[in-house]
Amino acid sequence: MYKYAFFDLDGTLTDSGPGIIDSAIVALKRFGIEIKDRKDLYPFIGPPLSESFRDMFGLDEENVKLAIQYYREHYNVHSIFAGNSVYDGIEDLLITLKEKGIKLVVATSKPAHLAIRVLDYFDLSKYFDYISGAVANERIHKHEVIAHALEHLQINNLDDVIMVGDRKYDVIGARQNGLKCIGVLYGGYSTLEEFIEVKADYIINKPMEIVDIVMGEKND
C-alpha cells in the first residue's frame, strides 16, 4: 500500500484542455501561426509552455518568452475556467483515498497560484495535503515539482509514493525521482502507445482503478 498519491492537474484531475488550447491559439496568432485543427495542440497539455512553444513551433528564446506572456494574458482572464471541468469519477476517487488514509498531493507544472485557483474553483483543494507547482518560472519541469513536494513533505521512503498523470512527462518526472507512475487514459490527451513507450508502471482507463493500485500494491 502507498501512503501518498501525487496527482498531475491538467488532463488528470480536470479537463482544462479547451482553455489551454484557446490561449495557445491566441498566442500563436501573434506570430502569424494559424492552427487549423485544435487536436494539433493536444501536446500542449502536459509539458512546460516554454518547451511547447520552442519544440512544436521553433520559436527562439526571446519569442518563447513573448509567447508565454501572450498566452498567460489570455489564459488568466479568459480561459482558466473556460470549458474546464472535473473528470467524472475524480471526486469519488479523492474521497475514497482520503477515507483510506492516503495523503494526496498535486504536482503540476502549472504555476502554483493558478493551480490553487482551479482547485478552489472546483472545491477540490480540501482533499489535498499539499499543492506543488511552478513559482516565478522555477520548478517548471515535472521532476522539479515532484522533488519539491517530496522535500516539503519530508518524505524519505520513496516506496510510499506513487504518481498519477496523463502524459509521458509525468512518468518520466516520477522516474527521475525514484517513483512509480500510473498513466491515465480517460483524459483523452495521451495514448496507450505513449505510455508503453516510456514504460509507465500502470495504465488505467477509469479514475476508480487508481484505488486498487494505491491500496493493493506491495511495496515493502
Regions found by a protein language model. Give the residues of each.
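Helix-loop "lid/cap" segments that line or gate small-molecule binding pockets
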Residues: 27-28, 48-61, 118, 149-152
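Short, acidic loop-to-helix structural element flanking the phosphoryl-transfer center
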Residues: 77-106, 112, 116
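Active-site neighborhood of HAD-like aspartate-dependent phosphohydrolases
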Residues: 1-43, 57, 191
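Acidic, Mg2+-coordinating phosphoryl-transfer loop and its flanking beta/alpha structural elements
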Residues: 163-202
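Conserved Lys-Pro-Asp/Glu-containing loop-to-beta segment of HAD-superfamily phosphomonoesterases
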Residues: 4, 142-171
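Metal-dependent phosphoesterase signature
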Residues: 54-91
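Structural recognition of alpha->loop->beta junctions
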Residues: 122-132, 194-212
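A short, structured active-site edge motif that brings together acidic residues
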Residues: 125-140, 160
